[in-house]
Swiss-Prot record:
The gene is RHO. It comes from Trichechus manatus (Caribbean manatee). The lineage of its organism: Eukaryota, Metazoa, Chordata, Craniata, Vertebrata. This is Rhodopsin. It is found in: Membrane; Cell projection, Cilium, Photoreceptor outer segment. GO terms for molecular function: 11-cis retinal binding; G protein-coupled photoreceptor activity; metal ion binding. Residues 330-348 are annotated as: Interaction with SAG.
């Protein structure tokens, strides 16, 4: 084995020289230079400074402006709530541990940090699944003139939390476990060992199939169907240009969210899958640290995409920031998310 396994950790460093110590008790400076740990801390500080204000503002602006409280926006707000969970439950913890060079909060703190990081990532993934299904049902109309209403949105939000908890909670109950990963300053699912005592192998397979592969298949199917439908409707000019433009812009926004999610999380999932399927292989701590910390940036991009691509929300946010007066105010057109639940784009 090219790593060192302990009762509740796995350090990607051979202990032939006797230098490996528990990541819960000693600095891990044999894995990387102190300045590299400082860089991780600085990165986490940046995510906190950017992630908290932008996600909190997303929630606050929606509460302040009644016209933003639409069914589709419930799902988007769900992403902001999940991101705030990651900021408070994960990023602040990792910032502190990176400054110390090891996971100072012990196994219990590792469970908390790993749980919030996994929960936030899974809520984001399943929210994108719900958004993809909503776009498919509204635009492609497989169920005739289905209207995506408030009750559907609430059920969608509840569904994302149930599925996210079905992934994040089992390691706390003894099916798999959370352990420090990479440079041992943040925690995640144990992809490094089979650990038969906690049936780790079966959980990792379950997680990759149910909580990654299936959601990706659903998302790609929905958007594949949606692209064909929008092209057909545009070619046949079956609906007004205004309606088609509104649907296209909302769909474009959600697709960009999916692409951003893939950019952030696929490297982490790929590395985790490689480590799991190549037990005992030789890899350094940076190999898992970089994709893990890159995935954490997901807490920033969703609200940024939403603000940049939604004129109505952007105007409301500027109005809130500027104390009731928007210096860049424009006449609000029909291209707003608040209108999309009444889509009239015809199916192919």
């Amino acid at each position: 084995m090219n790593g060192t396994e302990g009762p509740n950790f796995y350090v990607p460093f051979s202990n032939k020289t006797g230098v490996v110590r528990s990541p819960f008790e000693y600095p891990q400076y044999y894995l990387a230079e102190p300045w590299q740990f400082s860089m991780l801390a600085a990165y986490m500080f940046l995510l906190i400074v950017l992630g908290f204000p932008i996600n909190f503002l997303t929630l606050y602006v929606t509460v302040q402006h009644k016209k933003l409280r639409t069914p589709l926006n419930y799902i988007l707000l769900n992403l902001a709530v999940a991101d705030l969970f990651m900021v408070f439950g994960g990023f602040t913890t990792t910032l502190y541990t990176s400054l110390h060079g090891y996971f100072v909060f012990g196994p219990t703190g590792c469970n908390v940090e790993g749980f919030f990081a996994t929960l936030g990532g899974e809520i984001a993934l399943w929210s994108l699944v719900v958004l993809a299904i909503e776009r498919y049902v509204v635009v492609c109309k497989p169920m005739s003139n289905f209207r995506f209403g408030e009750n559907h949105a609430i059920m969608g939000v509840a569904f994302t939390w149930v599925m996210a908890l079905a992934c994040a909670a089992p390691p706390l109950a003894g099916w798999s476990r959370y352990i420090p990963e990479g440079m041992q300053c943040s925690c995640g699912i144990d992809y490094y060992t089979l650990k038969p005592e906690v049936n780790n192998e079966s959980f990792v397979i379950y997680m990759f199939v149910v909580h990654f592969t299936i959601p990706m298949i659903v998302i790609f199917f929905c958007y594949g169907q949606l692209v064909f439908t929008v092209k057909e409707a545009a070619a046949q000019q079956q609906e007004s240009a205004t309606t088609q433009k509104a649907e296209k812009e909302v769909t474009r926004m959600v697709i960009i969210m999916v692409i951003a999610f893939l950019i952030c999380w696929v490297p982490y999932a790929s590395v985790a899958f490689y480590i799991f399927t190549h037990q005992g292989s030789n890899f350094g701590p940076i190999f898992m640290t970089l994709p893990a910390f890159f995935a954490k940036s997901a807490s920033i991009y969703n609200p940024v995409i939403y603000i940049m691509m939604n004129k109505q929300f952007r105007n409301c946010m500027l109005t809130t920031i500027c104390c009731g007066k928007n210096p860049f105010a424009e006449e609000e057109g029909a291209t707003t998310v608040s209108k999309t639940e009444t889509s009239q784009v015809a199916p192919a």
